[in-house]
C-alpha cells in the first residue's frame, strides 16, 4: 500500500528535539516494513519566525513562501538524517522527483514545492498524482470538528465525514477571524476531487500514527471512524 503522510512542522519540529525526530523515524521505519511511505514535512514555528522577519523587512508574499519552503526542506533533511539508509537521501523538490524517488524502494521525505501551497495541499496533490491508497494528515488536533474547538466549547468532533462536508466546514471555519481549520481550503478541495481515503488525526505521538495507520491499512470497512482522528470518505 502506498501511503502519503503529511506531518505538520508544529508536530515534527516544535522544539527541534532530536529525540522526537528519532521517534518519528522509528515509527516510519516500522510502517515501511509493509508499505511504501512518502512524507511531506511542514515548516512549523521556525518557518513562521523567518516569514515574520521577511515581512518585516518588506519581502512580498511569494518571497515569504519560498522562505517557508526552504524551512520545510530543512525539516525534511533532519528526518532523512534520523531515518538513515532507510530514506531516499535527498528531499524531492517536485512531484515528479518524488515519483522517481519512490523507485528507490526507500522512504521518501520532502518539504514544500511551490509558493501558495501548504504542507497539506502538497500532500493531497502528491497523493492524487501518485495514486496513493491512503493519506494521513498528522496535525495538532484529534480530528475535524464542527467549528474550531479552541473557540467553541460546544464544537462536535466527527468520527466519519464526507469530503464535501469537510470542504464546507473548512471554508466556514476559515471565514471566522482567529479560527483555524484542521486543513486548508485547497487541500480539502483536492481531497474531494481525488476521493482518496484520508485520515486527519493528532500526530503528536508518532506511535499513535503508527498504530492508526497499521490498523486502517488492513480494514475492509472504510466507513468507520478511527481512534484519535476523523476519516474522510467520498
UniProtKB/Swiss-Prot annotation:
GO MF term (any one): UMP kinase activity
Regulation: Inhibited by UTP.
Positions bound to UMP: 43, 65, 113-119
Residues that hold ATP according to the record: 9-10, 44, 48, 139, 145, 148
Top-level taxon of the source organism: Archaea
Enzyme Commission numbers on file: 2.7.4.22
Keywords associated with the record: ATP-binding, Cytoplasm, Kinase, Nucleotide-binding, Pyrimidine biosynthesis, Transferase
Protein name listed in UniProt: Uridylate kinase
Localisation: Cytoplasm
Self-association and partners: Homohexamer.
NCBIfam families: pyrH_arch
Family from the record: Belongs to the UMP kinase family.
Main location: cytoplasm
Disulfide pairings: none
Amino acid at each position: 500500500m502506498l501511503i502519503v503522510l503529511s506531518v505538520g512542522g508544529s508536530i515534527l519540529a516544535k522544539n527541534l528535539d532530536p529525540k522526537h525526530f528519532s521517534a518519528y523515524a522509528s515509527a516510519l521505519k516500522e510502517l515501511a516494513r509493509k508499505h511504501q511511505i512518502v512524507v511531506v514535512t511542514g515548516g512549523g514555528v521556525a518557518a513562521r519566525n523567518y516569514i515574520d522577519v521577511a515581512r518585516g523587512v518588506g519581502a512580498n508574499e511569494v518571497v515569504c513562501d519560498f522562505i517557508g519552503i526552504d524551512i520545510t526542506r530543512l525539516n525534511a533533511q533532519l528526518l532523512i538524517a534520523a531515518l538513515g539508509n532507510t530514506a531516499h537521501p535527498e528531499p524531492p523538490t517536485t512531484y515528479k522527483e518524488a515519483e522517481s524517488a519512490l523507485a528507490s524502494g526507500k522512504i521518501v521525505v520532502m518539504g514544500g514545492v511551490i509558493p501558495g501551497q501548504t504542507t497539506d495541499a502538497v500532500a493531497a496533490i502528491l497523493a492524487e498524482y501518485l495514486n496513493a491508497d491512503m493519506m494521513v494528515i498528522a496535525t495538532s488536533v484529534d480530528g475535524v470538528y464542527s467549528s474550531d474547538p479552541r473557540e467553541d466549547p460546544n464544537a462536535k468532533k466527527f468520527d466519519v465525514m464526507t469530503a464535501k462536508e469537510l470542504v464546507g466546514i473548512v471554508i466556514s471555519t476559515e471565514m471566522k477571524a482567529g479560527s483555524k481549520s484542521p486543513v486548508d481550503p485547497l487541500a480539502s478541495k483536492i481531497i474531494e476531487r481525488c476521493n482518496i481515503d484520508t485520515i486527519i488525526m493528532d500526530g503528536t505521538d508518532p506511535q499513535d500514527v503508527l498504530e492508526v495507520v497499521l490498523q486502517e491499512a488492513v480494514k475492509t470497512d472504510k466507513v468507520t471512524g478511527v481512534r484519535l482522528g476523523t476519516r474522510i470518505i467520498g
